[in-house]
Amino acid sequence: MLSINLDDVMQVLTNVRSYLIAFGVVLALAIIVMVAVRKLPKAKKKMIRAQSGLAILLALTIVINLICTGPMSTMLDLVSGSGTINEETSAKATQLVNEITAEGVVLAKDEDNVLPMASGSKLNVFGWSSTNPCYGGTGSGALNTAYPVTDLLTGLHDAGIETNEELSKFYTDYKADRPSVGMVEQDWTLPEPNVNLYTDEMMENAKAFSDTAMVVITRVGGEGADLPTDMASVVDGSWIRRVAQAYGSERGTAYYNGTYDDSLNEGNDWDKGDHFLQLSNREEDLLDLVTSNFDNVILVYNGANAFQMDFLKDYPQIKGVLLCPGTGQSGFEGFGKVVSGEVNPSGRTADTYVSDLTAAPWWNNFGDFKYTNTEDLNSDASFFDPEGATPSFVNYVEGIYV
């Protein structure tokens, strides 16, 4: 579900500002009247003050009703469950999302005409993320599951591509849900099965099903926390302790509130110094397995953050690469149309995909850096900062935000 965002709260206050001002005027006038009659006879003063109090209550009632039936009407309907989005509006929104996705998918590589695949083709889709892809970001960019969601495999099926159901069941049986990455806390665990779980029979069945394989790699990131630059420290818990190490105090934000379950995939998902935007050990093993069994491999990177693609040079079997960020509620319909050739991919990269992210000049400059001499400006605990917040800064360098 959607997370609370301070900008959204401020927007609501802006929308109802005129109503609050009107009530404030009535309240001020009533208070002035109450003060002005203080020298009148007791009975008359009591009557006027009572009427002034009633006027305040009446004004408050009117203002609340005007707000609820005016600028807040749609929001209250949706929150209470009484509001609905009509079929026409929903259909238009779905069509727009599908068009945006279809036009935004980037064809980064296509050799030997591995893409597009004709409708009716069979495809082995590898990678746990194929059954749990990224649909959006975090905070206000999160997905609202109150409405139907089209997943990656459904998008392929609707485009006429038949996928290996044995592989899909293998992934959903392994883990049904994606670990949550949110604004307040982040579980960075990547549930990629250890390759020793792929049986010889499964791989033989896959090769008999199709000579083409797709591997899906996904990363989720967004508002509230930068992606970890040292996954090993997330695994051992020192990532959380960085607040104390860096600022000499436990007081900080939820910025480093990240965990990782390294036991899920039988351990050792990351080596020391590995960052979140590179292949994990399990993903490297998966690529080794797939490329040793298939000569026609399509890699799909599903994520909004530029991934480190230096590994592509090591796998000549990867002949196709598609970049597909979060697609929203139904955008994988558009993705399927790109794979099947119904839509010609026209997307272009908005970011630079470097072979080594750690060599970029901004690598050591982004973060959540705290002032150590601003105790008088610290804020108390809140929803956004459970441990309280300290004023922070960042040294801007070119490319840090793009």
List each language-model region with its residue ranges.
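C-terminal non-catalytic regions of proteins with extracellular/luminal or membrane-system context
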Residues: M1-V402
